[in-house]
């Protein structure tokens, strides 16, 4: 793949086996990698934008987000064939001015007021203090895929807004 590549457009690399992306790549558009990126989780050093469903990861693994990332679309990453207990999520560089992650790999706005991604650990899902808004489709609660599962308790849902 050329080192001068700065953007991958919709379906641009779908079906291509990709082991790494050039560090100067700045933008991954919607569905840009398709199934080609299932086994590599490190994002290019200078990447700025991740579009909707731009990455599909087979089974598990955390996506590394560098300090240069300015925008992550809702549902930018899809973990396929994952189940309760699989490790997934994000590891955001501390120097990133827009996003942060916690020890679980959950994704938040830098100020911690918006939760974009989280997955169920055990039988209860606890929304951390300080979170004011939660992206509803970013909660992986397992019982019936992405929706709130039977018997799953969301602790703190009465004090946040879902969008």
Regions found by a protein language model. Give the residues of each.
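Solvent-exposed loop and capping/linker segments of extracellular ligand-binding repeat ectodomains
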Residues: 1-163
